[in-house]
Amino acid sequence: MGSTPTIILAHGFWGGAAHWGRVILALSRLGHKDLHAVELPLTSLADDAERTRKMIAQQSGPVLLVGHSYGGAVITEAGNQPNVTGLVYIAAFAPDAGESPGGITQQDLSLIHISEPTRRRGI
């Protein structure tokens, strides 16, 4: 049986590492022991990915990356390290190679169908 991976959590743009506190507690109760929330500097995607890569490099075994919102773009950029075994996206950006989170949000959304009940609620 393989070793349990270290789990590294990357927060969203308006968050911080501390926002993962309840998730870390819940995962700990489920038996996960090696849990880390990376504090992203939020200066650029490149800087945030580099900070995450540094945390990945500090781990001796397999790593599972989890990204929420903007953190999804970060783990996409940082997740090509040899010891990364998987990427988990939670309501997150999952950009294609070379695509930025900003590019995703600027896409033409005019083709999205909004259902009638949603329109009635003013959404």
Question: What are the functions of these language-model segments?
Answer:
Residues 20, 75-78, 123:
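Hydrophobic packing residues within well-ordered alpha-helices of enzyme cores
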Residues 2-61:
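Active-site catalytic motif of lipid deacylating hydrolases and related acyltransferases
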Residues 64-98:
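Conserved hydrolase catalytic core segment
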Residues 112-117, 121-123:
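Single conserved hydrophobic/aromatic residue that forms the stacking wall/gate
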Residues 11, 68, 113:
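Histidine-centered divalent metal-coordination motifs
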Residues 16, 45-47, 93-106:
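A short beta-to-alpha transition loop/helix N-cap that caps and shapes the active-site region
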Residues 22-24, 51-52, 78-84, 101-106:
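Short, glycine/charged-enriched secondary-structure capping and boundary segments
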